[in-house]
Amino acid sequence: MVQKFMSRYQAALLGLGLLLVFLLYMGLPGPPEQTSRLWRGPNVTVLTGLTRGNSRIFYREVLPIQQACRAEVVFLHGKAFNSHTWEQLGTLQLLSERGYRAVAIDLPGFGNSAPSEEVSTEAGRVELLERVFQDLQVQNTVLVSPSLSGSYALPFLMQNHHQLRGFVPIAPTYTRNYAQEQFRAVKTPTLILYGELDHTLARESLQQLRHLPNHSMVKLRDAGHACYLHKPEAFHLALLAFLDHLP
């Protein structure tokens, strides 16, 4: 009788333990968001190469699968990243499948691009981007600029905004180097992207970027500074919506 009671007691404890394990499992966060969920098309060839000149810049490029190119998009990168980031995320391939030509470059000293004294000055950084665009025959482009690359993109925007079809800053640096009046003079269509959990650069850059007269803004929830890594699907949706509606 005692043994029968003990076996029932042990079975009850085992059942309770299994229930607790199940509840704990159900409460755990799900797997990371898939980075290629939006890209279901055929394989896309990612071309690579080096620009000409003294400061040779490594780049990755995809051409539109469709014959007609809807627009050209150039991707810069942040301090901890390089052009490969945009291939790993599937961003380049996705844009190719949607009819865009997309180019991602390694800034000097990152990835496969050698360091260059030229980019130690603002004028040198602008000249570098101008030369890259010319060498790759990029015209009327959309420039995507996260974080550190703001020190390249912002000076270029201020001097050559008439050459850009669109601008996508993602919590960029260098915004404090310009006055509100300078931002108001830029008419380029702009998509301001930032992560909800980025309480440093995003907040600082927004104070200035919001003065761009032709801008829209998207906050990616539960994402930090590198919001495109934390929420790639939401990032791709916002980017494509912006690109698809450019004049």
Swiss-Prot record:
What SUPFAM superfamilies does the annotation carry?
alpha/beta-Hydrolases (SSF53474)
Q: Where in the cell is it found?
A: Cytoplasm; Membrane
Q: Name one Pfam family in it.
A: Abhydrolase_6
Q: Give its E.C. classification number.
A: 3.-.-.-
According to the record, glycans are attached at 43
- Judged by the first EC level, this protein's enzyme class is hydrolase
Q: Has UniProt tagged this entry with the keyword Chloroplast?
A: no
Ranges annotated as spanning the membrane: 11-31
Q: Where is the active site?
A: 147 (charge relay system), 198 (charge relay system), 225 (charge relay system)
Give membrane topology per the record: Single-pass type II membrane protein
Q: Which GO terms describe its molecular function?
A: hydrolase activity
Which UniProt key words apply to this protein? Answer: Cytoplasm, Glycoprotein, Hydrolase, Membrane, Signal-anchor, Transmembrane, Transmembrane helix
Gene Ontology CC: one annotated term: membrane
InterPro entries xref list: AB_hydrolase_1 (IPR000073), AB_hydrolase_fold (IPR029058)
Which body tissues produce this protein? Widely expressed. Higher expression is detected in brain, kidney, heart, testis, ovary and uterus.
Free-text function comment from the UniProt entry? Possible role in granule neuron development.
The record's similarity note reads: Belongs to the AB hydrolase superfamily. ABHD14 family.
- Protein name per Swiss-Prot or TrEMBL: Protein ABHD14A
Q: What is the lineage of its organism?
A: Eukaryota, Metazoa, Chordata, Craniata, Vertebrata
